Amino acid sequence: MKTPPEPRVAAPRVFASPDISIVGGASSLESDLAMLGSLLDQTLARQVSGAFLDTVERVRQAADEDLDTSIEELEKLDLATTSQLVRAFSMYFHLANVAEQTHRGRQGRGDRDEDRGPLNRVTELIEDALAAGELKRADVEEAVRQLDVRPVFTAHPTEAARRSVLIKLRAVSDLLDERVSARRVANEDRRWRRAAEMVEELWLTDELRLEKPEVLDEARNALYFVDGLMRRPVTDVLLHLVDCLAAIGIELPVRARPLTFGSWIGGDRDGNPFVTPQVTTSVVDMSLDHSIRTMFLLFARLIDEISVSERHSEISKELDASLQKDLEVITNLDPRYRRLNYEEPYRLKLTCVRAKLESTLLRMQRRSRHQPGVDYHSSDELLDDLMLMYDSLMANGAEIIAHGTLEQSIRTVAAFGLTLTTLDVREHAEAHHAALGPLLDRVGQFDRPYLSLSREGRVELLSEEVASPRPLGLFPTALDGRDLTTFQTFESIRGLLNHFGPNACESYIISMTKGADDVLAAVVLAREAGLVELRSGVARIGFVPLFETIEELRRAGEITDQLLSVPSYRRLVALRGDVQEVMLGYSDSNKDAGIAASQWAIHRAER
């Protein structure tokens, strides 16, 4: 039976605005910490009791002054009070982290605005090196063209924060940012009342769910962050990169993709039986839905802004032909747009783009076939439409308009594509051998089981299989259980690529790679699923060995050399742009040898 709580010391609506005069300027970290601490104190007094707030303060002071005193103070508390105390300090640290992150972001933006950011410093170094003859401009331009940074989202088991909590912490961060530019005291009071509301909601919200989140829950949490990036921050970073490069006379092509995003959520099958092929498809469906709905907002703004009339500016022949074709094949276009925007070709084209996105979303929901010209199969098709407008504006004297919101939207679409992130799929090396065993044994070409072959024997056999156009047989009759699921994962990848285009999934990661045969086994399964056909020049995904243990990290170069010396595999790499991706180290590296040894092994492998 629960003990009744002590009477609360204040009515729920009682709120006292923190006094910023005692903690410095509005933008200081100390000010933010003090104000958030004050709001938390008020919440504890209202929602628990004044006596509890006194206890929190005594424990805090004891921890600052003397460890023994702190222990004595804690030993006096009952379990319920101790639990509340842990929550109180945890929440303070959450709020402190938010304040620090917001402060760092504020500093970064300030540095960028004053040309003191990291990109500014790098471009200054490049400019000095060019002037000194240490770098050639052609080499820098080529490096810019090849620039490819891809942060990857993953759902680590230790990341258990609920989206409800994340949203409230984000709101607190936004309020801290807004406070910097606040001018009126009334607005300041209103802002801190809103912050008090968020803090109180955080206190009354379960920090963790009682049930373990499912894969789709993890995906929703990740999409919360990606949505926020797509709405503005990534565009700002890309435009800053454009400005920095322009300062040294180098142009970043408008549809270049120097920054994209990847995700393991929904694709990381290693050790997680809940990541089924069906779940993988559902996660990508969800990502596409989020991406297109955010694009609706981007293009609504473009439609409002780009009201260029043919009465005042011509359009390119290419844009005119594309627009006429759109008007012929798009049946879900409201007739009034044809009438109202008849002499505003950019608005009309953007309205057609929006109609195609609506059809793309509908196609995904219905699992229907792609209709060229009616919906988009890939982000490249969407970018083609946007570039037609950009090129037309540039060719007809409207460069300022082209370089405005339209260019920003093109760079945003290039970064995120139709599915926001590119999915990486990962599976343990042994799973591929286990699935191949019964299939190869059934062929009957060998005098002993496939799984009993040495690594050298497997490499020889699998090298021939990768090059062979002969299928191993009908899988449903040969596989069951986990082996069937392993193969179906490759089938689901084929479905994703067919449905969402080549950017939906690009890399298949083989964890615990210990030899070239581990990668070749995955390639053979991919060939059976129609993802690889060397004689036809088909290599729809790349294969990434993941070296994790200390021994494999030491042998990473040797194993990679052996893999690339296999003619059939070398042909596959050539079809993928002559780039072999390798992944070094993961959490299992630390488990295998400890943090210091594993980091040193990774460092040596990278060199």
Annotate each PLM feature.
Residues M1-S463, D480-R482:
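Often metal-dependent polyanion-binding catalytic scaffolds in large enzymes
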Residues S90, Y390-S392, S507-S511, F543-L546:
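Short glycine-rich or small-residue beta-strand-to-loop segments that form or flank ligand, phosphate
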Residues R255-R257, I265-G266, R411, N498-F500, ...:
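A general structural signal for short secondary-structure junctions and capping/turn motifs
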Residues V329, C352, S359, T422-L423, ...:
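Active-site cores of enzymes that catalyze phosphoryl transfer or operate on phosphate-rich substrates
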Residues L406, A605-E606:
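Generic non-transmembrane alpha-helix signal with a bias for helix starts/N-cap capping motifs
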Residues S536-F543:
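Interdomain boundary/hinge elements
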